Amino acid sequence: MILFGSTGSIGVNALKLAALKNIPISALACGDNIALLNEQIARFKPQFVAIKDSKNKHLVKHDRVFIGQEGLEQILTECQDRLLLNAIVGFAGLKSTLKAKELGKNIALANKESLVVAGSFLKGAKFLPIDSEHVALKFLLEGKKNIAKLYITASGGAFYKYKIKDLNQVSVKDALKHPNWNMGAKITIDSATMANKLFEIIEAYHLYDFKESDALIEPRSLVHAMCEFKNGASTAYFSKADMKLAISDAIFEKQDTPILEAVDFSKMPALKFHKISTKKYPIFKLKNAFLKEPNLGVIINAANEVGVYNFLENKSGFLDIAQCIFKALDHFGAPKISSIEEVFEYDFKTREYLRS
C-alpha cells in the first residue's frame, strides 16, 4: 500500500490496521510531522518517503525522500503497488487522485474533496471510499434495485446542543470538541458547520450515481446510512463510531477480521433522527443547488478552506466560514468547467478573491 497523509488521523489508523494484517507499506508521505514519520519509517520500512517541504529533508531518516506534489507523483509512477490510500487533507489531495487514476491504481479515498471539486473528471477511477457513510451505502446498495432515496447521517458536530445566538462567541477549542469522532482539525470544523455532510452527499452522488439523497442528524452516530425503497421498505447500517471500520473495508481484501465490538441492540439507547436546520447550519442550504450543478464544488470547497483556516488561525469567527462561501458564490456563480485545468483555475481565483 502507498499511504499519503500517514501522520494524520486516517493515516495513523490505517497503519494500525496494516500491521494487523501484515500489509506491506511501500511508501509514506506526510506534511510536517517528521518525528512521527520517522517512527513510521522505522516500523514499516517503506521503499519511498515524501514530505511537503525540502527544508525538513535532512531530518527524515530515509535514503529516498521526495518533496512536494512532484515527489508524490514520482512515487506513484515508480511504485508498483496497486493501492493508494489518499488521506491528504483538502484540495491539496486532488493531483494525487488524478495521477493514481491515470496510472490505473485502486484509490482508497479519504480525500473527499477530490470528488467534490472534480468528480466529473474522475469517472472510471477505481474508488474504495473511506467514509463511514459511503461504506454504509455500499453495503446497503449491493445488488439492490428500486431505490427511492438514500440518507446519510450527521452527528450535528461540536455545536449540536448550542443555541444559534451562541455561535457568535464560540472558540476554536470549542469547535474541535467533536462529540463522537476523533478526527483531524479541518474535518472536525467541517462537521460543526455541516460542510462535511454537504460534501458527503456530493461524494455519494459521484460514487453511486444517485441524486435522490439527503442527510439527517442522528446524534449518537450509531446509524450511518439508510436506504429507502420504492415499495416503502427501508434498510439501515449500524456500527459504532470508529473510522477503522471504513478504512479496513477499503484496504482489506476480506471483511472477516473483528474490527469493532458490534452494536448491542438490547442495550442501545433510543435513537432519534432530526432534520438539519438551515438556520443553524446555513451551508446545508446549498444541497439541492449543488446536486443540480456539481461545478459549484470548486467554488464552495475553496471558499470553505479559506474560511476554515482563517477560523483555525483566529483571523475570523465561526459564522464567517459560511459567509465566506456565500460571498464567493455570489461573485462567481456556477462556473462553466470543461477541463480539469479550469478546476485549478477556479480554485486559485476563489482563494485570491477572498484574500483581496
From Swiss-Prot:
Cofactor names: Mg(2+); Mn(2+)
GO molecular function: 1-deoxy-D-xylulose-5-phosphate reductoisomerase activity; manganese ion binding; NADPH binding
InterPro entries (alphabetical): DXP_reductoisomerase, DXP_reductoisomerase_C, DXP_reductoisomerase_N, DXPR_C, DXPR_C_sf, NAD(P)-bd_dom_sf
EC class of the enzyme, as a word: oxidoreductase
Annotated residues for binding of NADPH: T7, G8, S9, I10, G31, N33, N111, E113, G184
Residue positions binding Mn(2+): D131, E133, E200
Catalyzed reactions: 2-C-methyl-D-erythritol 4-phosphate + NADP(+) = 1-deoxy-D-xylulose 5-phosphate + NADPH + H(+)
Binding site for 1-deoxy-D-xylulose 5-phosphate: K112, S132, E133, S155, H178, S191, N196, K197, E200
SUPFAM superfamilies in the cross-refs: 1-deoxy-D-xylulose-5-phosphate reductoisomerase, C-terminal domain, Glyceraldehyde-3-phosphate dehydrogenase-like, C-terminal domain, NAD(P)-binding Rossmann-fold domains
Pathway named in the protein's UniProt entry: Isoprenoid biosynthesis; isopentenyl diphosphate biosynthesis via DXP pathway; isopentenyl diphosphate from 1-deoxy-D-xylulose 5-phosphate: step 1/6
Keyword Phosphoprotein set for record: no
Enzyme Commission number(s) from the entry: 1.1.1.267
Keywords for the protein's UniProt record, in alphabetical order: Isoprene biosynthesis, Manganese, Metal-binding, NADP, Oxidoreductase
Similarity-based family: Belongs to the DXR family.
Protein purpose: Catalyzes the NADPH-dependent rearrangement and reduction of 1-deoxy-D-xylulose-5-phosphate (DXP) to 2-C-methyl-D-erythritol 4-phosphate (MEP).
Protein name: 1-deoxy-D-xylulose 5-phosphate reductoisomerase
Provenance organism: Campylobacter jejuni subsp. doylei (strain ATCC BAA-1458 / RM4099 / 269.97)
Gene symbol of the encoding locus: dxr
